[in-house]
UniProtKB/Swiss-Prot annotation:
Keyword match Cytoplasm: yes
Organism lineage string: Eukaryota, Metazoa, Ecdysozoa, Arthropoda, Hexapoda
Region (Globular): 1-274
GO molecular function, one term: plus-end-directed microtubule motor activity
Pfam families: KIF2A-like_1st, Kinesin
Coiled coil ranges: 205-244
Region (Disordered) location: 68-94, 117-211, 633-688
CDD domains documented for this protein: KISc_KIF2_like
Chain's gene name: Klp10A
Name of the protein in its database record: Kinesin-like protein Klp10A
Domain of life: Eukaryota
SMART domains reported for this sequence: KISc
Assembly and binders: Interacts with Alms1a (via C-terminus).
Amino acid sequence: MDMITVGQSVKIKRTDGRVHMAVVAVINQSGKCITVEWYERGETKGKEVELDAILTLNPELMQDTVEQHAAPEPKKQATAPMNLSRNPTQSAIGGNLTSRMTMAGNMLNKIQESQSIPNPIVSSNSVNTNSNSNTTAGGGGGTTTSTTTGLQRPRYSQAATGQQQTRIASAVPNNTLPNPSAAASAGPAAQGVATAATTQGAGGASTRRSHALKEVERLKENREKRRARQAEMKEEKVALMNQDPGNPNWETAQMIREYQSTLEFVPLLDGQAVDDHQITVCVRKRPISRKEVNRKEIDVISVPRKDMLIVHEPRSKVDLTKFLENHKFRFDYAFNDTCDNAMVYKYTAKPLVKTIFEGGMATCFAYGQTGSGKTHTMGGEFNGKVQDCKNGIYAMAAKDVFVTLNMPRYRAMNLVVSASFFEIYSGKVFDLLSDKQKLRVLEDGKQQVQVVGLTEKVVDGVEEVLKLIQHGNAARTSGQTSANSNSSRSHAVFQIVLRPQGSTKIHGKFSFIDLAGNERGVDTSSADRQTRMEGAEINKSLLALKECIRALGKQSAHLPFRVSKLTQVLRDSFIGEKSKTCMIAMISPGLSSCEHTLNTLRYADRVKELVVKDIVEVCPGGDTEPIEITDDEEEEELNMVHPHSHQLHPNSHAPASQSNNQRAPASHHSGAVIHNNNNNNNKNGNAGNMDLAMLSSLSEHEMSDELIVQHQAIDDLQQTEEMVVEYHRTVNATLETFLAESKALYNLTNYVDYDQDSYCKRGESMFSQLLDIAIQCRDMMAEYRAKLAKEEMLSCSFNSPNGKR
């Protein structure tokens, strides 16, 4: 560090390769580095440079240091011999050479120590210079004897190169006196030492680089690796995109293919055994439709085993990285997109045919999103808008019913087969075999639910059943949606009933239900009241259906069947040990239907999971523990059921032979019947509200408070509508009777001697009754209109949740 001082100007090299002058600001002795500063573009800049780099760019510092440390010896004049008089400065040159070589060796040792070079191995050869000659100066007699100087020349095994050793050795003669050749080489010797030091500095700079330079090289290396990796990823991306050209979901498709490559596919085969369950839950995946192919949809459903299904839901992380969330579901059966209707029927509805011949109630219903294939599975395949009913579950079950009926075991029972077909839309029941006539659902004195006015036709063969199915499907309420051009908007119920010949008692009944699309329940917050009521009814019916199936599995004492018309009609199918139910969950394989598919599968999974866990509760002693019902609960059950058994059918038609005095009480009796019906409807509504409260408590995680309030408002609206319509029907019948009485009273005035007092008295009584009926009808309609406005305001006050089921 002695050759450099603070304030000295030295050359430095920038990271971009530029070389310029800078001023030494700080010298770090321990770190062997120097801090330099320079002025550039109006500001002072600085950096830390290692000593090796400074010496490499400034070799003159080494030469200056060697010259400064080489102190000249005083010249002693002596008389030289005659033979040396031609070269009077030879002795001085030799002395200077020795001093310079000594200082050069010391300087080289310092440089090597600064570069952490191991200690040198000193050779055994010593350079001894014996000067015994007398030097004569200017003819004087005085002589000078030079002293003996021993110079040890270090030898480095690895640090010094051969060229450097040669230069140093050539600069110092071995055991000889200085001669003209040595004197001639004295000057270049010091220059050779400086050159060696410069070479060593360059080597140290190559091994010890500055931190900034190392960081730049590291960043450059990382950048090159990153670019190479990006190029590889781009090539892989192009290769994957070539597998699905033009598909925006190619990345998701590739992840699904990679996951499927780890699965072992063992699908359901036609020859496998059929299991017997009281409640069978299965799922069917339909093929991708032509519309989905045109939209570049991808298949996100995998069916690896006969009882397992996986939904590959694409998700995104916070950094927008895509990944798959694989949802696994397990059911009794899982049908892939290669299974046809015959195979689905074999494992679902066919085992239930035997149940109805043994005196049981069987139910098979299809559940799923609009366009998932429910009507295709239950009714038959579609060719455009024309449905082929021969390969649906309806027709195949009817065929097996007649085959079983002709077996010797059941032929002696003399059973009669009849069929009915109706639909449930927005809480109303319509007969599909009688021009969609509106029907009423009531309970008789034996607490049996009856569909009043339902058309039930006796059938003798499969062809007659097919005609009924075609007629009913043509009349069913449907509409066009984005998923399906012929979307079902109602629950269709097709029933095959077995009765003994000459009896009205039901021996067995098979109910096939094609449910409305489950995504319709999301429309409970729609701006259209009809759509809201339709969605609310679908929500209630599906939740009630699930709870009724749970009650069937647990053998529960109470069914919340009054919540919806669907469960009211199917009440007898959920009671008794001989009742069996089969659920077919229909799903769409497309990516756009992933959310609805998961809702459908979760609904079906809860049904089966609850049945497996909650069939019976075993006591420690091994006996089954029945569900206890208190006296208050039994009384509550009776209070909810008995009002329906005493409901009267209004009939205000009086015989034509009755006198005018007897007809007036008949009209008054009509009003009494109306009031009685209203009271019964109120009791029915109270029971329905209790069932709805029970349903909401059982499905607290699926129904929010806002949704429950909206359901209650819509229920109240539907009950009020039924009361108003029923009262209006009775008023029409009363008006027909009143018109006949009014004409008869008017005809009395054609006689000259008619009784004016009797005429006025009877007319006053008749019109008073008519006024009471009109006022009551007006008040009921005003109340109904107020409830409509209330429901409208309620639907606008909050947003309904996403239709959980």
